[in-house]
Every structure is written in C-alpha cells, then in structure tokens.
Regions:
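A short glycine-rich, hydrophobically flanked beta-strand micro-motif that places a catalytic Asp/Glu
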Residues: 111-126
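Long, well-ordered alpha-helical scaffolding segments within enzyme catalytic domains
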Residues: 89-113
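Short acidic, glycine/proline-rich loop/turn micro-motifs
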Residues: 86-89, 149-150
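Active-site microenvironments that recognize anionic phosphate/pyrophosphate groups
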Residues: 1-71, 76
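Histidine-centered divalent-metal-coordination microenvironment in nucleic-acid enzymes
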Residues: 73-78, 96, 123, 127-148
Length: 150
C-alpha cells in the first residue's frame, strides 16, 4: 500500500489548515457560551449516545474521539476544565487514571489490538486541540499501522 488515509479526519485536518479548530459538524470546539466542547459534553445536556460519551464518573468521563486516529480511539477527561495535571484535585487525578486503566482494558477486550498508546498533549505546542481542557488519549494500535498523528 502506497498511502494510508484516515478520511474521517479530513474535516479536522482541513480545519487546522484554515487555522480553525473544528468538531465533526465543522462547528468551533467551544460551546458557544464560553465553555469548551468538553465542558458541554461533561454537562450531558445533549445525551450520551449522541455525543459518544461511553462512561461517566463523579469527576471524570470517557468519550469516543470524533476524529479517531484509529477505530476505538477514546479520550478520558475531567468534567471540570483544567489545562494540566497540576490543576487536578486529588480526587480528579485518582479517578482520571483509574478511568484510563479501565478504558485500556475495555479497548483491549473489545478490539484485541496489538498494543495501546496512552498519551496527554499538554498545551497547544504539544498538540492539544483543546488546550484548556486536559484529556488523555487511549488509542488502540495494530502491527503495521502507520496512521498515528498528533
């Protein structure tokens, strides 16, 4: 194969080329009312099935990425908008990493990948699409895949 193309990421990539952060609908990543997209998802007003939220805990939740690097790409994040790890309370920190552990186990059980990437992009320069709201990526990987982008 000469080229691997993740067509489902086109709206995201083309939005970056235009200097705009977009979600699957092409809308900005904020909620239109000063909240980040993740804060809107955390509130749960739009229904979990419609917004791809797969788990809710007291301080954190998990959501399928609408621009997945691979099938099964999840994000785990605190409900509260926090830019980096040092801004988390102890309760949020513990639940975040416990949820990441559970997300990895779920991905491994459901998809049987050859491995899993777990990563956090802290700040726009590090690749964070929504730098004001920490999120941990859980990305299933298979031998020979080359579609990992940050």
């Amino acid at each position: 194969m000469d080229r691997l193309w993740a067509g489902w990421r086109y709206a995201y990539v083309s939005g970056l080329n235009e200097g705009t952060d977009v979600q699957s609908s092409g809308a900005p990543v904020d909620g239109g009312d000063g909240r980040t997209l993740f804060e809107v998802l955390a509130d749960g007003d739009h229904g979990d099935e419609e917004t791809f939220v797969v788990h809710r805990g007291p301080t954190c939740f998990a959501v399928l990425n609408v621009f997945p690097y691979t099938s099964g790409h999840l994000m785990v994040l605190p409900r509260r908008a926090v830019a980096d790890l040092s801004g988390l309370t102890d309760e949020e920190y513990i639940e975040l990493w416990a949820t990441v552990r559970d997300a990895v186990a779920a991905v491994e059980t459901a998809l049987d990948p050859g491995g899993v990437n777990v990563g956090v992009n802290l700040g726009r320069a590090a690749g964070a699409g929504i730098p004001g709201h920490l999120h941990v990526h859980v990305v299933p990987r298979w031998s020979g895949d080359t579609n990992f982008t940050t």
